[in-house]
Amino acid sequence: MSDLVKVTLPDGSQKEAPRGTPVIDFVKGQIGAGLAKAAYFAKLDGAPVDLSRALDRDARLEIVTTRSPEALEVARHDAAHVMASVVQKLYPGTQVTIGPAIEDGFYYDFARETPFTPEDLEKIEKATNEAIKADLPFVRSEISMEAALALFEGMGERYKVEIVKDIAAKGAKTLTLYKHGDWVDFCLGPHGPSTGRIGVVKLLNVAGAYWRGDAKNAMLQRIYGTAFFDKKELDAHLAKLEEVKKRDHRRLGPQLGLFTFHEYAPGAPFWLPAGTVLYNVLEDAMRRLVLKNGYQEVKTPLLFNKRLWETSGHWGKYRENMFLVVDSESDPALALEDRCSFSLKPMNCPSHHLIYRMDKRSYRELPVRYFTTDALHRNEASGSLGGLTRVRQFEQDDAHIYLREEQVTDEVLRIFELMKVVYGAFGLGFEATFSTRPEQRIGDDALWDRAEALLRKSLDATGLKWTLNPGDGAFYGPKIDMLVTDSLGRRWQTCTIQLDYAAPERFDLTFVGEDNKEHRPVVIHRAIYGSFERFIAILTEHYAGAFPAWLAPVQARVVTVSDRFDAWAREAAAALQARGWRVEVDGSSDKLGAKIRNAQLAKIPFTLVVGEKEVEARGVSPRRHGGEDLKTMPLETFAELMAREATAPF
């Protein structure tokens, strides 16, 4: 074995180094001090490693600097370790559990009987930033599972012991530890060179979290925080968080009269008049779009016998997420679960399969596209419910497409075209992820191989960049998920395209081919909005409640200088309403300034001022939401403006 290893750099050039040279020493000696100073971690043959890792083989080397978002993610994980060490120092007896980096920050879950207070958070944050300044190195080591178990048992860390036992049960022989100062934790890494490289930490809030996400387990305290290399970047992020709070749909929804919730129906929104208008506008727009693109609308029952779910596989794989209904004719002596022969449908696909199966199908008919907005019910854990983004009752712009295998790629491209129209209308950016087979699934590996290969080919044909999300597919097939980006740069999962070879087998779905023989179709499950509830939450925050004129529950409000102009105000509103616009009149006795201010607070796209000159001109003086005044114009001219700006774009 040679004493030298070949190191291939990103530009393709190669250098040699003595075997065992730490990455950081190689960078200092053969690339430059500037890169070494900026380096945070490295990648060897694509795998992330610490800068202290030895070059023990020929490999491709990439240095990740503090200019990279990937470095910031590692720094945030570093910050989680430092914060956890501080918490245990300040509050002896606190148990540590897990503490990953997450998008825009990090968290760590602690087991402690006494709740953390806002004052505690300030104290922890100050001590964390002081610990960072100590510039302690992160030291990596590997120990046997037996030694790891003895270590954490000796420390009294029962949650860590549980995790170590689980890792050992999966066949692992060693465990990676990271230590800074006298505090140690296990994780895969990598970590930065030392605590001093982390930057500045800000702790955000404390929330409850069940151990391992299971409500049957102990409730822990989760401290959320974030970290940035530069304080200016942190300040900008905190300003963004303040804007996020202002836009929170849970705040704006009730404020704008869109929706509310009640304890008698947890997880099921009450749509108020304004919200119902918004909901219906979105639904009607999608309906128009899909019906002119070859879809047929159907409606199916909400309640089904369990035999349907046994056929589909949901009874065995998804029952814990279903609302079960007792059969009134069942034996009262049976256990409650055994008396539940029915359930509310958690998804539409099985009932659509029944419709498809009702007729003999020819290859000439395919694709057959069924669309619905039926209500669905899923028994989500109460602790996971949150506003409109996680609910128990919802509707989707749901469609199921039955087609031949060779039609799949073209159909996926058609769906992407619809998606571009919809997301483009709202100014939402988007990107794709490809999710492959999960551990819990139906269908054999051969079917999954075909399904994944075909959906991957279809995704490649769209020309979009995408990322792999292994193991996150539906239990019946792989899927493409779309992540839309809102006006604050946040990503939300919405559209899904799922490929299903299993359902045609389970439901005995067929079509007669050109050879006059029966064949199995392929099924595509797809939704573009996702759920209406979640999409409305996204749009509410995207627009900060100031919806575009075509979508706004009230498109224009007429306000008068005084009540002597009420007659023309009502006549003008009625004329606009007759053309289909959503217009109302402020008939209050408030002064004009208050009326305008109230319309602005209600985020109505157009406020139409009516006074003496408007009555004489039989017109209005429009003011856009946000304050832009338009000149006085005849009512007909404003109606033409509405036709341009308030007509649904799809």
Swiss-Prot record:
Cofactor note: Binds 1 zinc ion per subunit.
Named cofactor requirement(s): Zn(2+)
Transmembrane stretches, start-end: none
Keyword Transport: no
InterPro entries, alphabetized: aa-tRNA-synt_IIb, aa-tRNA-synth_II, aa-tRNA-synth_II/BPL/LPL, Anticodon-bd, Anticodon-bd_dom_sf, Beta-grasp_dom_sf, TGS, TGS-like
Segments of this protein annotated with the region Catalytic: 248-548
Subcellular compartments: Cytoplasm
Gene3D superfamilies on file: 3.10.20.30, 3.30.54.20, Anticodon-binding domain, Bira Bifunctional Protein, Domain 2, Threonyl-trna Synthetase, Chain A, domain 2
GO BP: any one term: threonyl-tRNA aminoacylation
Main location per the UniProt record: cytoplasm
Domain TGS: 3-65
Annotated positions binding Zn(2+): 349, 400, 525
SUPFAM superfamilies: Class II aaRS ABD-related (SSF52954), Class II aaRS and biotin synthetases (SSF55681), TGS-like (SSF81271), ThrRS/AlaRS common domain (SSF55186)
Major enzyme class: ligase
Functional description taken from the UniProt entry: Catalyzes the attachment of threonine to tRNA(Thr) in a two-step reaction: L-threonine is first activated by ATP to form Thr-AMP and then transferred to the acceptor end of tRNA(Thr). Also edits incorrectly charged L-seryl-tRNA(Thr).
UniProt xrefs under HAMAP family: Thr_tRNA_synth
Record note on quaternary structure: Homodimer.
NCBIfam families: thrS
Protein name in UniProt: Threonine--tRNA ligase
Organism annotation: Anaeromyxobacter dehalogenans (strain 2CP-C)
